[in-house]
């Protein structure tokens, strides 16, 4: 059994819906003997440089005749077909599906499983993280290599495939950032080139320091402490290269490019900042009304702006301090039309009146006659006299049009000096998080802790019955760099352990530090995820699998009266500087979501690709100029990867996206060789790369055309041939008549 270090406990108060937690102060000079935490997340440039890749702009596999952002034919037809190749790590598959959900939540871009389409994306695990730009009108790869399986990195590569280049490639780049050319690695200078408006477009948006497509300050640097790119406004140096999520400008460009007018999974959102309260209505059969109030009164602080702005910051309020016990007020949403069968209603609330007050959530459903009037009670929240805003999640399962309804009920007006508050409502067609951990007074926690100190969450259960939790290191581990917050996952013993499978494998742990931005489309939350495996062992438990039964490999935790396994996560999950930005710490509160999902069904996802000759429209872009690269050393299709890429490539035959013929082992030099260089087509035929095979487009004129695999056979058009035969026949006839007439004259 593991030895434990002495701790002293500092009590903190948290939201009523979670158990009490304590800060565990570790003895100086000791690290956690029962912790196995990964390194800080690496960026794309680091991953690809370590893999020996020297791609265009660092992570773009560039065809020779594609001008993606300016070329309308490079826009994808939605939804985009995709394949998850079986050489992908299981965690990468889950992360890709998670990234898809972000696109669906924040744009009209959608994805569908491949069903034989000519254009599709296949996600594979090669060396590094890279993509092509735009729809190539044939199957194309996105590489999610080792270390690339983070939501933000995957979103970055998908944005390339959708048609976007890097932010610092803009024509006006030098107005906003400085490039330190002497600090760039030799042969990597091309990654910092800019391109004119004929090549890329900014879609009429300003330069975006916060873009997910921007390089970080230390990209491709010679010296790890000296940046290659800095911002002319110094405050943005810590922002460029963020790998949290899409920026607001990223989404503006994406939605403009694909003409999005709405998203797929966001059904409703309301921060109550407008007088029309987002189309919500007061009930007509209740006793009182919800009141639309602002933050101007003392103690009346909204959640959206937390009282930071005068004459702004609105919320809905139901006063429970007067009237009669049992009086109710109803607040109903507009009629909503779901596309999926599950929704998550998230909102912030507080109940400052009597503990007997209640907040009920109802849905009003279609009664099969077209009227939305059939009521069903979903969940009840009891008063707690807590003056702090709390987050709540309610799962709905609506398949027809409906309304959601908030009912406030007065419990004991005589003992109430407040009421019920509502703010920042979001309804999405996504699952609700399994576990929600709220940590209050986070600034005090950061100030009163040192490296190695930790907070442990209460126990949560997933749908299978596994108990789990999160460990927060406010100032990182003892071995971490200063100024970072660490985050790790662990298992708890629970009531269901006897019947559960151990060790628990193929489950993805997802930990999310919530950006409490009221509009879900603009949230830039940090999501970290990994998948459990039998190969994840620790010497601290004699080489046993970390994910075995906690009573077998864990240590006793008196806070939960249960056993807790070794932590697994990140010692430097997010910097304090980034944490202080945006809305991560709204109202001095940190909120962490945690899920534990079974990915076993994703172990085999690859589907066969039929071998066929396809002539995709728009693949041959005649008259267009290739990108002006200016450096022959820049990697292109046939020279983008080293001869020996990755020892971890699967040895069994795989069907590659660029070669859908017979099954064969990946031959990397051939795999990326351009089959049209040199041109195998004769008689001025044009060669087109179709799934890695040379396909000739033969010249056709008014009189002649060429056929054959290499355009080697010439033919005459049938109409012309008939005309020629007729002309020749007429000529012979005329010649015969002329000869006959001449002969008759000579005889006379």
Swiss-Prot record:
Post-translational modification summary for this protein = N-glycosylated; contains GlcNAc, galactose, mannose and a small amount of fucose.
List the active site: 157
Tell me the ranges covered by the MAM domain, including all copies. 265-434
Enumerate the SMART domains for this protein: MAM, MATH, ZnMc
* Cofactor(s) the protein requires to work: Zn(2+)
CDD domains recorded: EGF_CA (cd00054), MAM (cd06263)
Domain named MATH: residues: 435-596
Molecular function in Gene Ontology = metallodipeptidase activity; metalloendopeptidase activity; metallopeptidase activity; zinc ion binding
Q: Which PANTHER family match?
A: DISCOIDIN, CUB, EGF, LAMININ , AND ZINC METALLOPROTEASE DOMAIN CONTAINING, MEPRIN A SUBUNIT ALPHA
Subunit composition? Answer: Homotetramer consisting of disulfide-linked alpha subunits, homooligomer consisting of disulfide-linked alpha subunit homodimers, or heterotetramer of two alpha and two beta subunits formed by non-covalent association of two disulfide-linked heterodimers. Interacts with MBL2 through its carbohydrate moiety. This interaction may inhibit its catalytic activity.
Q: What is this protein called?
A: Meprin A subunit alpha
Tell me what gene encodes this.
Answer: Mep1a
């Amino acid at each position: 059994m593991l030895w434990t270090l002495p701790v002293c406990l500092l009590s903190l108060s948290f939201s009523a819906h979670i158990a009490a937690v304590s800060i565990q102060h570790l003895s100086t000079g000791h690290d956690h003997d029962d912790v196995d935490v990964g390194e800080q997340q690496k960026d794309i440039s680091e991953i690809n440089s370590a893999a020996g890749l020297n791609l265009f702009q660092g992570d773009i596999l560039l065809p020779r005749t594609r001008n993606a952002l300016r070329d309308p034919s490079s826009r994808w037809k939605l939804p985009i077909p995709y394949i998850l190749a079986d050489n992908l790590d299981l965690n990468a598959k889950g992360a890709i599906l998670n990234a898809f959900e972000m696109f669906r939540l924040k744009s009209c871009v959608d994805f569908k499983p491949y069903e034989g389409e000519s254009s599709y994306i296949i996600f594979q695990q090669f060396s590094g993280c890279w993509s092509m730009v735009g729809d190539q009108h044939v199957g194309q790869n996105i590489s999610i290599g080792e270390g690339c399986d983070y939501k933000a990195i995957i979103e970055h590569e998908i944005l390339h495939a959708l048609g976007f280049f890097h932010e610092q490639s803009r024509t006006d780049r030098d107005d906003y950032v400085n490039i330190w050319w002497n600090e760039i690695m030799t042969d990597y200078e091309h990654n910092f080139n800019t391109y004119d408006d004929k090549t890329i477009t900014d879609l009429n948006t300003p330069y975006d320091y916060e873009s997910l497509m921007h390089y970080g300050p230390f990209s491709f640097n010679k010296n790890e402490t000296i940046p290659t790119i800095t911002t002319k406004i110094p405050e943005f140096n810590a922002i460029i290269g963020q790998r949290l999520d899409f920026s607001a400008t990223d989404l503006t460009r994406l939605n403009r490019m694909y003409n999005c007018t709405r998203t797929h999974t966001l059904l409703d959102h309301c921060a109550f900042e407008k007088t029309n309260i987002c189309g919500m209505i007061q009930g007509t059969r209740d006793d009182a009304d919800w009141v639309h109030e602002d933050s101007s009164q003392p103690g009346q602080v909204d959640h959206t702006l937390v009282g930071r702005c005068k004459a702004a910051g609105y919320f809905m309020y139901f006063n429970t301090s007067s009237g009669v016990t049992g009086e109710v007020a109803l607040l109903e949403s507009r009629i909503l039309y779901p596309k999926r069968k599950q929704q998550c209603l998230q909102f912030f609330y507080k109940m400052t009146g009597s503990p007997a007050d209640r907040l009920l959530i109802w849905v009003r459903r279609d009664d099969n006659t077209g009227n939305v009037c059939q009521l069903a009670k979903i969940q009840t929240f009891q008063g707690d006299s807590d003056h702090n805003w709390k987050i709540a999640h309610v799962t709905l399962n609506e398949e027809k049009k409906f309304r959601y309804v908030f009912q406030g009920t007065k419990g004991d007006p005589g003992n109430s000096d407040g009421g019920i508050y509502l703010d920042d409502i979001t309804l999405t067609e996504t699952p609700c998080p399994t576990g929600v951990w709220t940590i209050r007074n986070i600034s005090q926690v950061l100030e009163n802790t040192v490296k190695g100190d930790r907070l442990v969450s209460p126990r949560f259960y997933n749908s299978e019955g596994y108990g789990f939790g999160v460990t927060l290191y406010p100032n990182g581990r003892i071995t971490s760099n200063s100024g970072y917050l660490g985050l790790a996952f662990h298992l708890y013993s629970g009531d269901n352990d006897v019947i559960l499978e151990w060790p628990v494998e193929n489950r993805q742990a997802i930990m999310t530090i919530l950006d409490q931005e009221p509009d879900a489309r603009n949230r830039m939350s940090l999501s970290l995820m990994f998948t459990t495996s039998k190969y994840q062992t620790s010497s601290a438990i004699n080489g046993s699998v970390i994910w075995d039964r906690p009573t077998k490999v864990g240590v006793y935790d008196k806070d939960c009266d249960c056993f807790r396994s070794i932590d697994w996560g990140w010692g430097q999950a997010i910097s304090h500087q980034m944490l202080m930005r945006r809305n991560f710490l709204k109202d001095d509160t940190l909120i962490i979501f945690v899920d534990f999902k079974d990915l076993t069904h994703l172990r085999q996802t690859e589907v066969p690709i039929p071998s066929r000759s396809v002539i995709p429209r728009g693949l041959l872009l005649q008259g267009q100029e290739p990108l002006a690269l200016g450096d022959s050393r820049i990697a292109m299709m046939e020279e983008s990867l080293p001869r020996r890429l990755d020892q971890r490539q699967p040895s069994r035959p795989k069907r590659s996206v660029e070669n859908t013929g017979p099954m064969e082992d990946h031959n990397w030099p051939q795999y990326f060789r351009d089959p049209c260089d040199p041109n195998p087509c004769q008689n001025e035929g044009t060669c087109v790369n179709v799934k890695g095979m040379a396909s000739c487009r033969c010249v056709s004129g008014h009189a002649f055309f060429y056929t054959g695999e290499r355009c080697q056979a010439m033919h005459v058009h049938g109409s012309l041939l008939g005309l020629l035969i007729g002309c020749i026949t007429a000529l012979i006839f005329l010649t015969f008549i002329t000869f006959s007439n001449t002969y008759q004259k000579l005889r006379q």
